[in-house]
């Protein structure tokens, strides 16, 4: 298993903001397993999406923002996003852990458009193009049709901005329903890195779900792994020696810490590769790749 190569506390390394699902696909498709990014959800404003390259595809996992300011992915809850990423550094989502963030592209994101022929007298104004119809839900909302150009007046909230249409009417618009227009610069400079376009909301059923337990992948899915016959715990205790040190994540109370040379009494061998065992009275889960089974009756196997 590859080790993680990122600092979860460095939000700028992995949070990409309002990146569309299609752009996430483009950035991650064909990349190494475990490359990922965190983006804003266009389906549920305020939520996030963890997009990951795994098993020759790109999976998208919804991260719900809870009222108690915690975050939920699958059946797991976390105090903050760095804690969630730390957890999935050593726990598999489906077939991979999180290894490294996707690199930031210096050029404007795919799908962003240039604002043609905008009045030079309004050089400091920010324009957006509407992605589809919005009828308006409240009196303060600004209804619009798909394809309109709007001028942003102010941004009082993260997901709701004040805008003006061509008729001079002002009202609130939902940010996920529009895309920013990147003004072409005569000096050839790119637009602001945060000028990402929002895509049409993706359906809820398009999201993947992480495994409900904390498994490692099956032996067969581990490249280069040899599939050897394993003893059964039904025939009596099975013992193994730790061949790799393991320091569990502080957020995971189910993991078993291991020191090289520890003798582990294996109590269960799950087919997903996450075994259960006991060391000096401590019980928990550990990856089978960290131990080597031996026969207590044969000292030669202890070498």
From Swiss-Prot:
Phosphorylated on tyrosine. Phosphorylation is prominent during early development, but decreases at later embryonic stages and in newborn mice. One of its GO terms (cellular component) is protein-containing complex. Residues 14-102 form the SH2 domain. Disulfide bonds: none annotated. GO terms for biological process: acetylcholine receptor signaling pathway; animal organ morphogenesis; anterior/posterior pattern specification; B cell apoptotic process; blood vessel development; cell chemotaxis; cellular response to interleukin-7; cellular response to transforming growth factor beta stimulus. The modification Phosphotyrosine is found at residues 127, 207. Belongs to the CRK family. May mediate the transduction of intracellular signals. This is Crk-like protein. It comes from Mus musculus. The lineage of its organism: Eukaryota, Metazoa, Chordata, Craniata, Vertebrata.
């Amino acid at each position: 298993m590859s080790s993680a190569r990122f600092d979860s506390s460095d939000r700028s390394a992995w949070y990409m903001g309002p990146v569309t699902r299609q752009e996430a696909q483009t950035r991650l498709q064909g990349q190494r397993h475990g490359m990922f990014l965190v983006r804003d959800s266009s389906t549920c404003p305020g939520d996030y999406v963890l997009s990951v390259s795994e098993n020759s595809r790109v999976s998208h996992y919804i991260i719900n923002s809870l009222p108690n300011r915690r975050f939920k992915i699958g059946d797991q809850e976390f105090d903050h996003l760095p804690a969630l990423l730390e957890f999935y550094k050593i726990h598999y989502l489906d077939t991979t852990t999180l290894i490294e963030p996707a690199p930031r592209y210096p050029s404007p994101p795919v799908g962003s458009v240039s604002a043609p022929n905008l009045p030079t007298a309004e050089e400091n104004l920010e324009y957006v193009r509407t992605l589809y119809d919005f009828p308006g839900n409240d009196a303060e909302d600004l209804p619009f049709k798909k394809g309109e150009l709007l001028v942003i007046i102010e941004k009082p909230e993260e997901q709701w901005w004040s805008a003006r249409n061509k008729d001079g009417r002002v009202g609130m618009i939902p940010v996920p329903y529009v895309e920013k227009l990147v003004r072409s610069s005569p000096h050839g400079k790119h637009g602001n890195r945060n000028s990402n376009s929002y895509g049409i909301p993706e359906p809820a059923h398009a999201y993947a779900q992480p495994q409900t337990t904390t498994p490692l992948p099956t032996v067969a899915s581990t490249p280069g792994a040899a599939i050897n016959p394993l003893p059964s715990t039904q025939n009596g205790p099975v013992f193994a020696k730790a061949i790799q040190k393991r320091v569990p994540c502080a957020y995971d109370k189910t993991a078993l810490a291991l020191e090289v040379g520890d003798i582990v009494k294996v109590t269960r061998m799950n087919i997903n590769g996450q075994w259960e065992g006991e060391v000096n009275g401590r019980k928990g889960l550990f990856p089978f790749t960290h131990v080597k089974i031996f026969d207590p009756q044969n000292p030669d196997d202890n070498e």
